[in-house]
Amino acid sequence: MSSKVHLGHTARKRFGQNFLTDDNVINRIVGAIVPDNDHVMVEIGPGLGALTEPVATAIDNLTVVELDRDLVERLQNHPVLKDKLTIHQGDALQFDFSQLVVPGKKLKVFGNLPYNISTPLMFHLFEFAEQIETMHFMLQKEVVLRLSASPGNKAYGRLTVMAQYFCQVVPVLEVPPHSFAPPPKVDSAVVRLLPYAEKPFPCKDVNVLRQLCTTAFNMRRKTLRNNLKQVLSDEEFEQLGIDPNLRPEQISVEQYVAMANMVCDKQA
């Protein structure tokens, strides 16, 4: 049987499907998630149910968002899970997660995310950060390194700044390719994202911060002065105590927020 066929389902490349099969890894992830009935538990991309089964067993109801119609049908007919699942068939990138919030209950979101959509999905989920208690995701190891990077690290970029603006980022464990069927060509890792109840560096307009980061990191090898000359002058950099000769990856989250807030003040 092809390595792309697991439990009778052929992994679809266009959906970025790699199914988790390592029981030890599964148990460690479920232990990190801490399933409970005090939150709305939400799984993105349940696939063949490697995480779905142990999580659903521990709680009364699990909400899942799955794009693949064949996998949705399997879950709808699952002898054990079907009565515990609330299934949304559709694209998580377009999904309004705020509709899942119940009064007095925040979301706990988790999933073995398709690697081809993981970065845009992170940005989408940050929009709902205030409604989310925790997020646990299996990602390409390189993405986890980007999420958790410090200034000066080559992995530090736009995703880093936005993730660390909204969340505390905690790498949980690394997962080798042989833990999946079919094995991906890259190493994987699990990350915990804890949205801040109160952000350490509040921004006056997060859209300005997002645009500023996009502009700053568009040409990583150039200086801030070069990349941000349309929005900040040398005098304004001096006011902020930021050296405009530095490169974008050398600037902290706090400094990016300070720059964005200055841009907001100028636009007011």
Curated annotation (Swiss-Prot):
Alphabetized InterPro entries for the sequence: KsgA/Erm (IPR001737), rRNA_Ade_diMease-like_C (IPR023165), rRNA_Ade_Mease_Trfase_CS (IPR020596), rRNA_Ade_methylase_Trfase_N (IPR020598), rRNA_adenine_dimethylase (IPR011530), SAM-dependent_MTases_sf (IPR029063)
Stated role: Specifically dimethylates two adjacent adenosines (A1518 and A1519) in the loop of a conserved hairpin near the 3'-end of 16S rRNA in the 30S particle. May play a critical role in biogenesis of 30S subunits.
Pfam families tied to this protein: RrnaAD
Full protein name: Ribosomal RNA small subunit methyltransferase A
GO molecular function, one term: RNA binding
E.C. no: 2.1.1.182
Reactions catalysed according to its record: adenosine(1518)/adenosine(1519) in 16S rRNA + 4 S-adenosyl-L-methionine = N(6)-dimethyladenosine(1518)/N(6)-dimethyladenosine(1519) in 16S rRNA + 4 S-adenosyl-L-homocysteine + 4 H(+)
SUPFAM superfamilies assigned to the protein according to its UniProt record, in alphabetical order: S-adenosyl-L-methionine-dependent methyltransferases (SSF53335)
Sites where the protein binds S-adenosyl-L-methionine: 18, 20, 45, 66, 91, 112
Entry keyword Methyltransferase: yes
SMART domains associated with the record: rADc
Coiled-coil spans in chain: none
